[in-house]
Amino acid sequence: MNESNGVLRDARKLGIPKMLILGLQHMFAMFGATILVPILVNSYFVDACGEGPSRGLTVSVTLFCAGFGTLLFHLCAKFKVPAFLGSSFAFLGGFATVANLDTGIFADMTMGEKLPYACGGIVVAGLLYLVLALIIKLVGVKKVMRFLPPAVTGPIIICIGLSLAPSAVSNASTNWLLALIALGVIVIFNIWGKGMFKIIPILMGVVISYIAALIMHFAGMTNADGSAILNFSQAATDAVVGLPPFQLCKFDLTAILVMAPIAIATMMEHIGDMSAISATVGSNFIEDPGLHRTLIGDGLATSLSALFGGPANTTYGENTGVLELSKVYDPRVIRLAAVFAVILSFFPKIADLISTLPSAIIGGVSFMLYGMISAIGVRNVVENHVDLTKSRNLIIAAVILVCGLGFSGGLTFTIGGTSITLTALAIAAIAGVLLNAILPGKDYEFGKDPQADKNRGLDMNFMDNK
């Protein structure tokens, strides 16, 4: 059945023009965060004279790698999982560490010369995904997922959304009027919209609030800090058409030891994201196409991106929020967004024009998207009847939430002179899994309650019943 309760699983019923519009909506949802990563990374590689890398991470390469990586992920996942892979923020600490390396071969390097070695470390990090995928394939996904009951995955999904909340507020605070316009338009179209408009509230929020930004800009209004609402300077200088400036990565053991361990954190995030998407869509992606396949897709996308000078890729919560809001679960729509990203990478001027989207609008949109992700986590807990009157479940949830929200800057420690950073979500996931394994009194065993598994979108028994 393709449609029930407003859910659409085959977007082809809408026709190609409407599918293209839905693809644009997903592209806009990921765009702001995806292009922010190369901007932040390049800021770490500015030398004492204020000179940055001559060929740092670029927006064009980042967009190409995000789009191509998403298509590769869908191929590995048998075209079944509606996930978009954008730039990962988890490796920012690793980039900063490599930028500050001043021993061995890095002693006489400029900042720009160090950057390819950081990318080389990410290539190895991506290959570690394949190792975990092999382990899961050998031992079976059921045994792995028994360590992730609703008492663990629910709070983790809540943290995925709430950990992004400060970013939404920070962006919105640059111009609260624009942010409220974007948020208000999304709410209006989602609640009162009819037909096609009801399933593209994010796109409508972006378009209408951008029109408002244009009016405010040319009327002489400014942001809260006095800066211009719109800045077209970069778009005026770049060429209309051009190849993304790819550059090959380089390898060094020190840089690998900095970047590769971060994969532990991102793999835990991947499992949380797959659980969130499964719960959102109501399909068991952990079993079919299988967690090992999604890990392979994510790992290969990350390695290939870094191999040619791009950032690591990761499944994007923003697009999960769009799925929940639009109720259109067709992976074809995500693939259209990926194709748009690849096409944009060859048109730097168009990419720059989209980059003029004010931070306040991104913040207003994020209010809805990030909140939706957390709401999915709450629903995960409620629908599975997680008993929070039991001390065991309460302790697990409490520790996960505090770790996920408290370690906002991650946890950095040094091993053998190498600085390693675990993200807040990785800390929360590791803490939750360990507590679930150690504490007595388990009241939920994975695979034994078909209805509970179905509520999570993780019906592990359907394969046995065929």
Residue ranges and their predicted role:
Residues A96-N100, N190, N319-I334, F340-L344:
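Interfacial segments of multi-pass membrane proteins
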Residues N100, T110-A219, A338-K448:
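Membrane-embedded alpha-helical modules
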Residues L57, F79-F91, V144-T153, K198-M204, ...:
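Short, non-helical or kinked segments that cap or interrupt transmembrane helices
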Residues M1-P82, G93-G112:
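N-terminal signal-anchor module of multipass membrane proteins
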Residues N42-H74, P261-P331:
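Membrane-embedded helical hairpins/re-entrant loop segments and their flanking transmembrane helices
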Residues L24-F28, L148, V152, A172-S173, ...:
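Hydrophobic alpha-helical transmembrane segments of multi-pass membrane proteins
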Residues M1-I21, N223-P245, A279-S283, T294, ...:
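Intrinsically disordered, low-complexity non-transmembrane regions of multi-pass membrane transporters
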Residues T34-I35, S209-M221, D225-A306, G310:
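Membrane-embedded hairpin module used as a gating/binding unit in multi-pass transport
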